[in-house]
């Protein structure tokens, strides 16, 4: 059984590919059930964010696990192969440690990914998809992330994607305080972005969400109001800034809707930031005059601020991670011996029961207990000594020398020459 991590991220694949492989939160239970049922994995956890889709699993066949991913999304291997990475054993652990520590993020050192990883593990746990191997991996992953953040400055001076959204808007408009801002969706990402915009005291904050009640709860945090997604077409023209991040599998803001809004605005500019994967806004919207449409990949340059200082801290973090990977590798090797230990104990127990059964029969016949115990001890001694004695009597050359050294070390013997 292999520990395997595979998937793609913002380093290896453009948004147009990443959105094809996304797992909305509501699909995770079904996806995990399907993966385990396919027997391509015994344990599994799926991490799906705007920047990455990764599967961590215990798999008897890495190729089968990858085939499942392609089949689940209706994609061909050839279509995905150029963008995928596959990591096994210690390399899979190293990757998990780096991801949780923010070293593999678009924003070096950002903390949001750690929460997303924990959410993925909780989803896998609720689906009954976690076992000893992945539990061991993720317990260590979260411990490493905590150690990195407490021991280094890797997260210092970072510009989050949420803060970058405000900076982008300020490049287009002179002041956020004069703007009407619309947030589409009511999840964690929208809440983070809304917090940064609210700090600039915009003229109006509105949250559009599929369920009005959830939208209202979020809007109230920022003194705003809420509308339903059905109200978007008639309301869109009111807003100067539109930030979207929903779990919709299809775009919810189309070119026609935005064209009508821009016309109603008399061609005043509109800033749109689509943080969803798959995208919430049709790609063609970006071709419209007076519309400034950005995706998660477009804000990469802004989040580079302060990266040099964090890069130095990242080198310290890599040293910590390397040490913890070595410890995890030792744990993996010990796990591999568990079946052998179990088989060894089973064999010893069979020998014990066989000898005991014979001794009890002798006692039942009236044999002297002393003789029965003596025979029992001799029988067990011979049984235990037969395998090493046979090994010492067989083989030749280097093989024999290795067996001699192994048995001497195993039994802690130091025979005189």
UniProtKB/Swiss-Prot annotation:
Enzyme Commission code(s) on record: 1.2.1.70
GO BP terms: protoporphyrinogen IX biosynthetic process from glutamate
UniProtKB keywords: NADP, Oxidoreductase, Porphyrin biosynthesis
Pfam families the UniProt entry points to: GlutR_dimer, GlutR_N, Shikimate_DH
UniProt cross-references to InterPro entries, sorted A to Z: 4pyrrol_synth_GluRdtase (IPR000343), 4pyrrol_synth_GluRdtase_dimer (IPR015896), 4pyrrol_synth_GluRdtase_N (IPR015895), GluRdtase_CS (IPR018214), GluRdtase_dimer_dom_sf (IPR036453), GluRdtase_N_sf (IPR036343), NAD(P)-bd_dom_sf (IPR036291), Shikm_DH/Glu-tRNA_Rdtase (IPR006151)
Reaction(s) the record says it catalyses: (S)-4-amino-5-oxopentanoate + tRNA(Glu) + NADP(+) = L-glutamyl-tRNA(Glu) + NADPH + H(+)
Site (Important for activity): 95
Domain of life: Bacteria
PROSITE patterns recorded: GLUTR (PS00747)
Annotated metabolic or biological route of this protein: Porphyrin-containing compound metabolism; protoporphyrin-IX biosynthesis; 5-aminolevulinate from L-glutamyl-tRNA(Glu): step 1/2
Positions contributing to substrate binding: 49-52, 105, 110-112, 116
Entry text on domains: Possesses an unusual extended V-shaped dimeric structure with each monomer consisting of three distinct domains arranged along a curved 'spinal' alpha-helix. The N-terminal catalytic domain specifically recognizes the glutamate moiety of the substrate. The second domain is the NADPH-binding domain, and the third C-terminal domain is responsible for dimerization.
Function in brief: Catalyzes the NADPH-dependent reduction of glutamyl-tRNA(Glu) to glutamate 1-semialdehyde (GSA).
Similarity section: Belongs to the glutamyl-tRNA reductase family.
Name of the protein: Glutamyl-tRNA reductase
Native species: Chromobacterium violaceum (strain ATCC 12472 / DSM 30191 / JCM 1249 / CCUG 213 / NBRC 12614 / NCIMB 9131 / NCTC 9757 / MK)
Gene: hemA
